[in-house]
């Protein structure tokens, strides 16, 4: 787009409005380079980025970006083979840190759907090794000791030598106190010296570095210190050399990634610019407009960004409308209306938000031309009319159907009759060429042109006859009218004179009455529209409040869930710890009594997650009533799965049962009846445990062949627990070879189990790699 329109509309001042919201020099540079485009995909991308950033701010209202400096020149120097200095490395360090923080922010972002912004976040590079290298430079511009072993060694020696110098000088201060003018160590020419009285200058051996103005004090570097100072100077030279070597080394490490770092810096700047746009939206109540594909423009409550307390107006430039002609007297805001339309289009086509209400639409124009204001050339001795006409002639040769044209005071500066005729002829030429035009004029003849001509519409700026001031309200569809008689009368001009004047233009009075009626109708419609807008604004505010509350509730819910998860994890950890202790206690005993096994199993059962209390289930209660327990019934004790027999019913409703060799007292909810005759017995998954009395103790075998992975792992867990409860020293697990999935699962399980001493494949004659032998700790 031509630069002249950007200067005319003061686009640089518009861009300056976004600068306070920027945090990076890269973002500032991109803002300064910003210009309107006619590429729809670019504009749509910019609009989508702003909308996504708005959604991001709803979830993360304090989202920010670390400030960064421009590094394009630094990266260019690297690519050309130059070595960087500490200040330049600090600039790169800041960019890498900002990139890492943005990546971390994006990785932890929830409840926001991003597409366009996601592309930028995901293009950022991660350089953990380079970040580690750059930690050698602290923010004060100092190379840390850990940058290299040699640097650390040199600095240790410098520190030791300087300590020796201080010790020597402190000793001399005490020993030679009577020879010194002051009991302090001074510095001259970078050397540590003593202020010696001139009368004692020969009593202290050393190098004289200075004499006071009075000649009473001689500044001597003691001989004992001279050698140490020379060593320190030599070490300082070594330190500088080592620091240069470190700068060269790190430059070589960073050099291959210079282009990637420069690209990251650009992305950081781009995200910063999008963020600044959204901050502007929040500050100025701006909006992201819709994009029209057919040059249709609909601006709702649009304002000029540079005008303080600007009046908001509606402008509708439909697809079929070719020209809007704003008529009426000067100083009513016609030129501002013209600039507002042009500037809003320039901002939108530059990917910026506009000062308007939601629902506003903008078109796409390849060029925007304007003839606004007095551009008379004194050097060329051109009149106002000639200056405007020269510009218009140039514009008419360049415009086409993809252009927007803004003409201020068309035909002004010459004879009114000829000027009006010329203005109508120019507008007609533009209409026939279907070029969208907004023009202002004070010629009344153009009112009739706007009424009588298709695809052309009149408009005007409202004038308050009560206050004799313009309201700057845009009235589309209503031509401007002269208020000269009304103003003259209010200012005190004789009614006779005003009456005589009005009789001379009776026909014009009829037109003015019609215009006045149109104005009244327009004002009434505007009041209704304003009321509707107020309701819409209240609804929008309520919607924002509800959305904020909804997000806060979601965050609180997630916080509570996280707390619950943490508490659950703590409970599980405690349960696992208790179960391990139970197993250790069992394993430490060589022999176990039956009741000890039962008690241990019951303890383990209590550690399991709580289940639904089936005793309160009405269906199960009805089923139990149909078959009440009686003496002699076979039962299954629910707490540890052992079968037994009811031997007697106690007075308190409990039952006595014989379970193996143990007599137990149980409540009805603690056992189930076993229906042997009516139903087929349910096969329980059993672990085949075979006890032997050989020297190495009992053994067991588990066969997992043909099992699904999850089923096999559950059986393995149960099998190992039972083996530990039975104090077994060794067990065999048959898993087969197959795909190796179950075998790998067995291996991982055994590696995690702290009770396993060792495990390995069986001998070839006992199954080879299809079986694993496990030995437990003693």
From Swiss-Prot:
ATP binds at residues 328-335. It is an enzyme of class 3 (hydrolase). Keywords: ATP-binding, DNA-binding, Endonuclease, Hydrolase, Nuclease, Nucleotide-binding, RNA-binding, rRNA-binding. One of its GO terms (biological process) is rescue of stalled ribosome. PROSITE patterns: DNA_MISMATCH_REPAIR_2, SMR. One of its GO terms (molecular function) is rRNA binding. InterPro entries: DNA_mismatch_repair_MutS_C, DNA_mismatch_repair_MutS_core, DNA_mismatch_repair_MutS_sf, MSSS, MutS, MutS2, P-loop_NTPase, Smr_dom. Residues 702-777 form the Smr domain. Gene3D superfamilies: 3.30.1370.110, P-loop containing nucleotide triphosphate hydrolases (3.40.50.300). Pfam families: MSSS, MutS_V, Smr. It comes from the Bacteria. Its EC number is 3.1.-.-, 3.6.4.-. PANTHER family: OS10G0509000 PROTEIN-RELATED (PTHR48466), SMR DOMAIN-CONTAINING PROTEIN (PTHR48466:SF1). Homodimer. Binds to stalled ribosomes, contacting rRNA. Belongs to the DNA mismatch repair MutS family. MutS2 subfamily. Endonuclease that is involved in the suppression of homologous recombination and thus may have a key role in the control of bacterial genetic diversity. Acts as a ribosome collision sensor, splitting the ribosome into its 2 subunits. Detects stalled/collided 70S ribosomes which it binds and splits by an ATP-hydrolysis driven conformational change. Acts upstream of the ribosome quality control system (RQC), a ribosome-associated complex that mediates the extraction of incompletely synthesized nascent chains from stalled ribosomes and their subsequent degradation. Probably generates substrates for RQC. This is Endonuclease MutS2. The gene is mutS2.
């Amino acid at each position: 787009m031509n630069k002249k329109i950007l200067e005319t509309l003061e686009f640089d001042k518009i861009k300056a409005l976004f600068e306070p919201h920027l945090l990076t020099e890269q973002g500032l540079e991109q803002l300064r380079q910003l210009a309107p485009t006619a590429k729809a995909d670019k504009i749509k991308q910019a609009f989508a980025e702003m909308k996504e950033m708005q959604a991001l701010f709803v979830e993360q209202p304090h989202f920010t970006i670390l400030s960064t400096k421009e590094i394009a020149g630094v990266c260019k120097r690297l690519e050309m083979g130059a070595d960087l200095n500490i200040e330049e490395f600090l600039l790169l360090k800041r960019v890498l840190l900002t990139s890492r923080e943005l990546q971390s922010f994006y990785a932890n972002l929830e409840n926001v759907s991003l597409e366009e912004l996601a592309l930028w976040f995901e293009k950022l590079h991660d350089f953990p090794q380079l970040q580690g290298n750059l930690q050698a430079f602290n923010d004060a511009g100092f190379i840390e000791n850990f940058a290299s072993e040699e640097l650390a060694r040199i600095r240790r020696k410098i520190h030791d030598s300087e300590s020796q110098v201080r010790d020597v000088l402190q000793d001399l201060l005490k020993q030679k106190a009577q020879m010194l003018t002051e009991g302090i160590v001074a510095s001259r020419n970078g050397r540590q010296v003593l202020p010696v009285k001139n009368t004692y200058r020969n009593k202290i051996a050393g190098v004289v570095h200075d004499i006071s103005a009075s000649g009473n004090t001689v500044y001597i570097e003691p001989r004992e210190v001279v050698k140490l100072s020379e060593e320190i100077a030599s070490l300082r030279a070594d330190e500088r050399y080592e620091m240069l070597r470190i700068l060269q080394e790190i430059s070589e490490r960073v050099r291959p990634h210079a282009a990637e770092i420069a690209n990251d810096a650009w992305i950081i700047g781009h995200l910063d610019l999008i963020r600044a746009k959204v901050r502007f939206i929040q500050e100025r109540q701006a909006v992201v407009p819709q994009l029209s594909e057919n040059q249709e423009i609909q601006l709702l409550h649009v304002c000029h960004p540079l005008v303080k307390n600007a009046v908001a107006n509606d402008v509708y430039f439909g697809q079929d409308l070719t020209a809007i002609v704003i008529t009426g007297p000067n100083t009513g805001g016609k030129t501002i209306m013209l600039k507002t339309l042009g500037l809003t289009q320039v901002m939108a086509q530059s990917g910026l938000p506009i000062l308007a209400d939601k629902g506003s639409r903008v078109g796409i124009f390849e060029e925007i031309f304007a003839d606004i204001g007095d551009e008379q050339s004194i050097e060329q001795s051109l009149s106002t009319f000639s200056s405007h006409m020269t510009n218009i002639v140039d514009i008419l040769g360049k415009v086409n159907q993809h252009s927007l044209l803004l003409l201020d005071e068309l035909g002004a500066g010459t004879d009114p009759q000829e000027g009006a005729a010329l203005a109508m002829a120019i507008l007609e030429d533009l209409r026939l060429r279907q070029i969208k035009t907004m023009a202002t004029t004070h010629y009344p003849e153009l009112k009739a042109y706007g009424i009588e001509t298709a695809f052309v519409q009149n408009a005007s700026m409202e004038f308050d006859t009560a206050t004799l001031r313009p309201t700057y309200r845009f009235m589309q569809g209503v031509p401007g009218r002269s208020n000269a008689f009304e103003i003259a009368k209010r200012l005190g001009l004789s009614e006779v004179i005003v009456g005589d004047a009005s009789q001379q233009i009776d026909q014009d009075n009829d037109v003015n009455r019609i215009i006045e009626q149109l104005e009244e109708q327009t004002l009434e419609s505007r009041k209704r529209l304003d009321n509707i807008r107020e309701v819409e604004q209240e609804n929008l505010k309520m919607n924002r409040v509800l959305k904020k509350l909804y997000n806060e509730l979601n965050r609180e819910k997630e916080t509570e869930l996280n707390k619950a998860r943490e508490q659950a994890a703590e409970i599980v950890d405690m349960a696992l710890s208790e179960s391990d202790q139970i197993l250790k206690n069992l394993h430490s005993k060589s022999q176990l009594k039956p009741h000890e096994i039962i008690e241990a199993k019951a303890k383990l059962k209590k550690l399991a997650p709580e289940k639904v209390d089936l005793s309160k289930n009405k269906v199960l209660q009805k089923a139990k009533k149909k078959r009440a327990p009686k003496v002699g019934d076979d039962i299954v004790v629910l707490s540890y799965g052992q079968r037994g027999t009811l031997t007697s019913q106690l007075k308190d409703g409990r039952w006595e049962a014989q379970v193996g060799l143990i007599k137990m007292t149980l409540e009805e909810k603690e056992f189930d009846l076993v229906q042997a005759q009516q139903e087929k017995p349910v096969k329980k998954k059993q672990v085949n445990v075979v006890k032997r009395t050989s020297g190495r103790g009992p053994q067991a075998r588990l066969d997992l062949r043909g099992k699904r992975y999850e089923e096999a792992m559950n059986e393995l867990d149960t099998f190992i627990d039972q083996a530990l409860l039975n104090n077994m020293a060794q067990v065999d697990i048959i898993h087969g070879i197959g795909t190796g999935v179950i075998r790998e699962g067995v291996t991982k399980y055994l590696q995690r189990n702290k009770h396993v001493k060792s495990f390995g494949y069986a001998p070839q004659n006992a199954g080879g790699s299809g079986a694993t032998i496990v030995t437990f700790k003693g």
